[in-house]
Design a protein with these regions (language model features):
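Ferredoxin-type iron-sulfur electron-transfer modules in oxidoreductases and energy-metabolism complexes
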Residues: 3-27, 42-64, 81-113, 161-178, ...
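Conserved phosphate/anionic-ligand binding catalytic regions in large, soluble enzymes, centered on
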Residues: 36-38, 178-200, 299-311, 472-484, ...
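Iron-sulfur cluster-binding cysteine motifs and their immediate structural context
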Residues: 73-78, 481-487, 575-593, 604-622
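Flexible inter-domain linker/hinge segments
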Residues: 110-180, 334-337, 342-357
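Hydrophobic alpha-helical positions that pack around
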Residues: 133-134, 263-391, 403
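Accessory "access/gating" subregions that flank catalytic or transport cores
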Residues: 163-204, 362-363, 368, 373-377, ...
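Short amphipathic, charge-patterned alpha-helical segments
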Residues: 238-242, 391-409, 669
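Tandem CBS (Cystathionine beta-synthase) repeat/Bateman regulatory domains
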Residues: 620-693
Length: 693
């Protein structure tokens, strides 16, 4: 394509592509070629489609798109003109796809999404519960265009915001529009982008930089990666608008090298924009110049921190430094020049704000957190993937309406938001609106958008240990509170999860966590204790069980509990005896038993048992089980629902409102209470008779 020298040329070229690209009525498939779908075979599916089309002599346009969101069901694709949405497509399915979709004009039912095998499938993407409540702004082009073809981006109105800004708006107008939109940074801190832009604009000096933070290091988070892979021109246009607004001539996109597809697509997009005259010197003949390049990072989590990121761009080790000066001030940015730093999703939201206006953006979301947010929904949820929803949507809607609920019909336990620096929220917060301020108030954070769903089989102490082990390993080691404090906290957590917890460990964790928050230099250290402190706040009873009862209710931690064989379930296969390294499993004439004098709670027998006959019990409840013949599960239920140990219950006295009887069996009473799901207190006399409920 020939270089465009003026705004009219851009407008004409866009109109031409709108007419010539994506013509209506022709056979077309939009196949997801994001990282997740590539891993599940989308490239082979495309080869299968090409081979089938060639064999039939039929022309089918294939659009290799970015991530379409429903990563759990990849490879996914849509077929046009009917718009059928297909999931888990395999190369062998292409024949059926052509026979049904393009010959008979009906969907290939085998490939349609359905909630369960007994329910009717969904034909269109917009009808799926996963997509129905989503509203796409940052991901608006993902799944529609080929990210390596600038014609596709122009054909759907791309660079229209840049055209509008250069032709009808001053730099001050652009800054003011972003400020009025109250666009808050999507990288985690939630600082208003407009105020950051204005601060950089007012900084003295002719040389300024625009930086995009694509160093997405949170485990299980892939929001920014999907934008860079699937819609790189949206990012470039957002950075161009920022550069025009603040008077910057240079820019960097900082991406971790573990994102090879994102790096490839970004470099292709930059080259295409340069060839077309949308990057470089004298853009569209307006006198505005902007040079952009990709800088690859080595993958250190700390380089997501702004000052460490700048140091990495400059070629130094990614060490955070104290502020001021801020990045937007002289001496604070790249090579000392004022620099504006936002994350990928923030820049992707800028073009639609300029095109549609700040009022449109503020009409979405909440008053203090307008717009949408992209979340990487992962963990023990039916539908994992990328979701973009208006700010203020509740956790329940995201997890159960969009995510489809908990895998295997299990019970929801917690959700971890904000990545390794975020917090864990219990079931009581499912109706909490998701926005910056609401999450911060309850001890968590938005972060970059990670959302990990946890079920009843998850140990919250182990979750805290996992996230702290990540942040501790990623600490740069510059400041002692983070370097030494996280090491000490991790040591305590590892001791607790190995059944070696000490009485004062919980208070030590709280004290250390607060010290690290107050004394660390950068955001990584300041937020590192969040998973530990939030789990202690909301799941303290699990910590107490680990420390005081040597018991893990989720049966995750080794070295805890009393191992027993449920003889009613045992099939006498002998696998438990074969794997026991300590000869703790003994074989009698009719049964297998576990000798707890030899048992080291390694859980080898627990994992190998094919019928789940190995049970792990809390030692303090075994005597009650044996003495009163109360089912163990009911004992655990009563203890948890009363929020008291049965030892506390037995030592308590009945109140004046308690009806006392002396002829009631304890097992009968507990069965009645458990059946009604009543959290009750049992009081017995010295002979073991029930004297109060």
């Amino acid at each position: 394509m020939q270089k465009i020298n003026n705004i009219d040329g851009l407008r004409k070229l866009r109109n031409d592509f709108m007419e010539s690209v994506f013509k209506e009525g022709i056979p077309r498939v939009r196949v997801c070629c994001g990282t997740a779908c590539n891993a599940t075979g989308s490239k082979k599916v495309i080869e299968g489609i090409k081979a089938e089309a060639s064999e039939r002599g039929q022309e089918v346009e294939i659009v290799k798109t970015g991530c379409q969101g429903l990563c759990q069901k990849g490879p996914v694709m849509t077929s046009e003109p009917a718009g059928y949405f297909y999931q888990k497509v395999k190369p062998a399915d292409t024949h059926e796809l052509f026979v049904n979709t393009y010959e008979a004009g009906v969907p290939a039912r085998k490939l349609l999404y359905r909630d369960s095998i007994l329910e009717e499938p969904y034909e269109l993407m917009g009808d799926l519960p996963f997509y129905k409540k989503q509203l796409r702004i940052a991901l608006r082009h993902n799944g529609l265009i080929d990210p390596t073809d600038i014609k596709h981006y122009l054909a759907i109105g791309g660079y229209g915001a840049l055209e509008k800004a250069l032709s009808t708006m001053t730099p001050e107008d652009v800054v003011e529009e972003i400020d009025r939109a109250t666009l808050r940074g999507r990288g985690g801190a939630g600082f208003p982008a407009g105020k950051k832009w204005l601060h950089t604009k007012k900084a003295p000096g002719d040389i300024k930089f625009v930086i995009a933070n694509g160093d997405e290091g949170d485990p299980g988070a892939f929001m920014d990666r999907s934008i860079m892979e699937g819609d790189p021109h949206s990012l470039i246009e957002g950075m161009l608008l920022c550069a025009y607004a603040i008077g910057a001539g240079y820019g960097f996109i900082y991406v971790r090298h573990e994102y090879p597809l994102a790096v490839r697509n970004l470099k292709i997009a930059i080259r295409q924009a340069e060839e077309l005259g949308l990057l470089g010197e004298d853009i569209l003949g307006t006198g505005f110049s902007f040079v952009l390049e990709v800088r690859e990072g080595a993958g250190a989590f700390v380089c997501g921190e702004s000052t460490a990121l700048v140091a990495s761009i400059e070629g130094d080790r990614g060490f955070p430094r104290s502020r001021p000066p801020r990045l937007s001030e002289p001496g604070g940015g790249v090579w000392g020049y004022p620099s504006n730093l936002n994350n990928i999703e923030t820049y992707a939201c800028v073009p639609p704000i300029i095109e549609k206006g700040s009022g449109w953006f503020r009409s979405i979301g909440t008053e203090t957190s307008p717009g949408t947010k992209v979340f990487a929904l992962t963990g023990k949820v039916v539908n994992t993937g990328l979701v973009e929803v208006p700010m203020g949507m509740t956790l329940r809607e995201i997890i159960f309406d969009i995510g489809g609920g908990i895998l295997g019909g299990k019970k929801f336990k917690a959700v971890q938001t904000g990545g390794p620096s975020g917090g864990c929220l219990p079931e009581s917060y499912l109706d909490l609106p998701v926005d910056f301020d609401s999450l911060r108030k309850v001890g968590s954070m938005m972060g970059s958008g990670g959302m990990v769903v946890l079920d009843e089989d998850t140990c919250m102490v182990d979750v805290a240990r996992y996230f702290l082990s990540f942040t501790q390993a990623e600490s740069c080691g510059k400041c002692p509170p983070c370097r030494i404090g996280t090491y000490q906290m991790l040591g305590i957590l590892e001791r607790i999860t190995q059944g070696k917890g000490e009485v004062r460990d919980i208070e030590r964790l709280i004290k250390l966590g607060k010290f690290i928050q107050e004394g660390s230099l950068c955001g990584l250290g300041q937020s590192a204790p969040n998973p530990v402190l939030s789990t202690i706040k909301y799941f303290r009873e699990e910590y107490e069980e680990h420390v005081y009862d040597n018991y893990c209710r989720a049966k995750v931690c080794s070295g805890m509990g009393v191992f027993r064989i449920n003889l009613n379930n045992c099939i006498r296969c002998g696998l438990c005896k074969q794997v026991c390294a300590y000869d703790a499993v003994k074989e009698t004439r009719n049964d297998f038993i576990i000798d707890n004098d030899y048992c080291r709670q390694c859980k080898a027998c627990y994992h190998v048992c094919p019928v789940g006959a190995i049970k792990i019990w809390k030692k303090s409840l075994i005597s009650l089980y044996e003495r009163f013949e109360i089912p163990y599960e009911q004992l655990e239920h009563i203890e948890r629902s009363t929020k008291m140990t049965l030892k506390d219950v037995l030592e308590s006295k009945p109140s004046q409102m308690v009806t006392c009887t002396k002829d009631c069996k304890i097992s009968d009473a507990v069965t009645i209470m458990d059946g009604k799901n009543v959290g009750s207190i049992l009081v017995m006399d010295k002979d073991g008779q029930l004297v109060g409920i």
